[in-house]
């Protein structure tokens, strides 16, 4: 049992070390070569994650295979808090993504999105001007509105209404159905006179760098994509959490074996 648990912890952490190398390399590459806001947003988290995994993996390998008890204890201490963090984040992700979905519009294939339908916590994130300015820049650089305009260049209004738009395209590239604007192209609409209950109608602009990027519908479209992504992450986290618990249990066995081995040596016994 001594050799099995220690060796297993060492092998598992060796694979974690191998995993950390491409993550760290990608983060460094992005920090040096990134040209867009979206790419630059990912470099520091990836570097931090890569370094963290590398340090944890080295501690696990050395602590278990070289029988360094204090290092293995530190490894288990960090692993315990990592399990708690992953568990809390998974629960949090399911809670904040439990609300909100697209609204079906009669006579149209696409859905529209209302910011009020999503959780208060998510709403506060996108209503923060600093956060949204960064997100908006990222959305604009992704050029999905430009691509939509190319795909629907020859569409009539009836053709456009048959398009199954993504949440981004529906929320950011066109005005709300409440505005009742006149269709010219997918990203160009003639405004109608009068007042509108939906504040997004006043925010709509035909200029390509504006469109509806500041609209509540665009924020809602972003949250709908974020919601779907977080749910996938939460499911992956459950699997990851199970693996963490298994590795932690093996680490506890290895820690106990290290102590027994040290006790045996101090008393003139050999436990190998």
From Swiss-Prot:
Stored InterPro entries: TET_plant, Tetraspanin/Peripherin
Similarity comment: Belongs to the tetraspanin (TM4SF) family.
Ranges facing Cytoplasmic side: 1-7, 67-75, 256-272
Keyword Nucleotidyltransferase: no
Side Extracellular, residues: 29-45, 97-234
Annotated source species: Arabidopsis thaliana
Intracellular or extracellular location(s): Membrane
Residues annotated as glycosylated: 154, 190
Topology versus the membrane: Multi-pass membrane protein
UniProt keyword Aminoacyl-tRNA synthetase, yes or no: no
Protein name listed in UniProt: Tetraspanin-9
GO CC terms of this entry: membrane
Keywords, ordered alphabetically: Glycoprotein, Membrane, Transmembrane, Transmembrane helix
């Amino acid at each position: 049992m001594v050799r099995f648990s220690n060796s297993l912890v060492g092998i598992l952490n060796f694979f974690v070390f191998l995993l950390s190398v491409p993550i760290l390399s990608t983060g460094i590459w992005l920090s040096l070569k990134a040209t867009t806001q979206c790419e630059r947003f990912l470099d520091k988290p990836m570097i931090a994650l890569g370094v963290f995994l590398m340090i944890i993996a080295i501690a696990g390998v050395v602590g278990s295979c070289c029988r360094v008890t204090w290092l293995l204890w530190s490894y288990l201490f960090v692993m315990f808090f990592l399990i708690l963090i992953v568990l809390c984040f998974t629960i949090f992700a399911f809670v904040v993504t439990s609300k909100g979905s697209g609204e079906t519009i009669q006579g149209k294939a696409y859905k529209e999105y209302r910011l009020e339908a999503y959780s208060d916590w998510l709403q506060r994130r996108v209503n923060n001007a600093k956060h949204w300015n960064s997100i908006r820049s990222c959305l604009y650089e992704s050029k999905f509105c430009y691509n939509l305009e190319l795909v629907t260049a020859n569409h009539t209004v009836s053709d456009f209404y048959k398009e199954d738009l993504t949440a981004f395209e529906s929320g950011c590239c066109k005005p709300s159905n409440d505005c009742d604007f006149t269709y010219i192209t997918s990203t160009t609409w003639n405004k109608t006179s009068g007042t509108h209950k939906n504040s997004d109608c006043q925010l709509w602009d035909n200029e390509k760098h504006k469109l509806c990027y500041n609209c509540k519908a665009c924020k809602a479209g972003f949250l709908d994509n974020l919601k779907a992504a977080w749910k996938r992450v939460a499911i992956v986290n459950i699997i990851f959490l199970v693996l963490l618990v298994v590795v932690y249990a093996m680490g506890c066995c290895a820690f106990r074996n290290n102590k027994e081995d040290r006790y045996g040596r101090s008393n003139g016994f050999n436990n190998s």
